[in-house]
Design a protein with these regions (language model features):
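Juxtamembrane and boundary regions of transmembrane helices in multi-pass small-molecule transporters
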Residues: 3-9, 13, 25-26, 35, ...
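Interfacial loop-to-helix junctions that mark the boundaries of transmembrane helices
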Residues: 43-53, 88-92, 109-121, 141-145, ...
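Membrane-interfacial helix-loop connectors
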Residues: 1-6, 10-18, 35-51, 162-254, ...
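Small-residue-rich segments of transmembrane alpha-helices in multi-pass membrane proteins
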Residues: 15-24, 82-89, 98-99, 147-161, ...
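Transmembrane helical segments that form the transport core of multi-pass membrane transport proteins
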Residues: 101-211
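Long, contiguous bundles of hydrophobic transmembrane helices that form the permeation core
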Residues: 60-111, 118-121
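Transmembrane helix-loop junctions at the membrane interface of multipass transporters and ion channels
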Residues: 30-45, 104-115, 301-303
Length: 303
């Protein structure tokens, strides 16, 4: 494994790929898409439309990671390199948690009645915690510290960002967004510096308002922000929804605060003794020179 040579860039590329870009296909991959699913976007709707752009983005990031990793390995002193090349022995414990993971995934498809979905997810997570042997938690350095840290941070972010997003919801149509690429870069820019989940919701609302203004007859009888209105939007302007989805998910990787899991990964890695870039080091050393050009190119090619 990589435990003898894990570096800051391993954490960064994990955030790029696993916490963000990798989850762009379905609602269980990233929080914004799950919110879209709750608002009326069918589960596999996005998968059918973004697979190529997702594949190109992920492949480009993985190619850059491969170059980083090869260079890092080549620069290692001989003794650590010999340790890294030796076959590791490992064992799999806590297999019961696969069952609970499947329960949580299955709960996504439950009807939203009396918070049944959320109750099943919470029950599965709680049961998993108490049934997992404490030795497994100890070996994996499990603690609630990163979860608490992220919770407090994003309470502050949500509190301060709501006025800006509220203004966007009311006056967004005045900006004249009429092309998918505008939605891609605008939702991406805000997702990079704010949390991408509420940003997605606001731009989905903006897309609906724009489409409603262009063709009010198509939205007749559908309340603003309703499931019916979102489903009409999927027919009238599917490219807008694709652009907002990709912008929110992809650009959420630009900073630690762009997506909730980003900061959690950083906190877990830090607690495990792994060196992580600072907030601005992450941006100026990795996301701006590496990720941003890839996302711009993908937007120009596919959105």
């Amino acid at each position: 494994m990589n435990k003898v040579r894990i570096s800051a860039f391993h954490v960064v590329f994990f955030i790029f790929i696993v916490s963000n870009v990798g989850g762009a296909l379905t609602p269980i991959g990233d929080p914004p898409l799950f919110i879209g699913y709750l608002r009326g976007v069918p589960f596999f709707w996005l998968l059918e439309r973004v697979f190529t752009s997702w594949l190109v983005t992920a492949a480009a990031i993985l190619a850059v990671f491969y170059c980083f990793d090869r260079r890092s390995f080549a620069r290692m002193p001989r003794a650590p390199r010999a340790d890294a090349e030796q076959a590791d022995t490992w064992r799999f414990e806590g297999g019961i948690n696969i069952l609970f993971l499947l329960v949580i995934i299955g709960a996504v498809f439950l009807p939203d009645t009396f918070f049944l979905r959320e109750a099943v997810m919470l029950a599965a997570a709680t049961t998993s915690y108490f049934l997992t042997p404490k030795t497994v938690h100890a070996v994996n350095s499990f603690s609630f510290g990163p979860i608490k840290e992220v919770a407090f941070l994003f309470i502050g972010i949500f509190t301060t960002m709501m006025p800006a997003l509220g203004y966007l919801a009311v006056h967004g149509v005045e900006f004249g967004f009429t092309r998918p690429l505008q939605y891609y870069f605008a939702s991406g820019a805000l997702s990079a510096v704010l949390d991408n989940a509420p940003t997605y919701v606001n731009f989905l609302q903006l897309a609906e308002s724009t489409a409603r203004a262009a063709n009010p007859a198509a939205f007749a009888g559908a309340a603003v922000g309703s499931v019916a209105a979102v489903q009409i939007l999927l027919v009238q302007q599917p490219a807008f929804v694709v652009a907002v989805s990709l912008g929110a998910v992809f650009f959420g990787a630009m900073t630690y605060i762009g997506n909730g899991p980003n900061f959690m990964v950083k906190s877990i890695a830090h607690d495990a003794g792994v060196h992580c870039p600072s907030f601005f080091g992450y941006i100026f050393k990795y996301s701006l020179p590496i990720l941003l050009p890839i996302l711009i190119l993908v937007g120009l090619l596919f959105v």
